[in-house]
Amino acid sequence: MSYRIPAQTRIGHVHLKVADLQRALDFYCGLLGFELMTTYGKDAAFISAGGYHHHIGLNTWYSKHAPPAPVRSAGLFHTAILYPTRKDLAIALKRLVDADYPIQ
């Protein structure tokens, strides 16, 4: 029996395994402007936009100091952040460019 998820379904949050928590926070909070909501010891942080409990969880539980995953391995490939206006998107892009962050 097949089932199709309703079109109104939304993803509430995602958790990302990171090698360096501070580096991830520098990117998501420092460059993109997400808010740090809380931390869980030295191994996890929860960030959001607009005061939500967390849109993104960042953790090093099984990935601390790990090398980047090989290009041809399974895993998350792309994430899109929908800014409310083109101006907000332009601000984020300028911050990335000004920080010499690689954009592909």
PLM segments and residue spans:
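Short amphipathic alpha-helical segments
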Residues: 10-14, 75-79
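Vicinal oxygen chelate
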Residues: 8, 18-22, 80-104
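Core segments of cupin and vicinal oxygen chelate
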Residues: 16-62
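Generic structural signal for well-ordered secondary structure
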Residues: 40, 51, 72-74, 89
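A detector for short, charged/polar N-terminal pre-domain segments
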Residues: 1-6
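Conserved donor-binding loop and adjoining core beta-sheet/short helix segment
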Residues: 59-74, 80
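Short acidic, gly/pro-rich beta-turn/loop elements at beta-sheet edges
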Residues: 26, 57, 68, 89-91
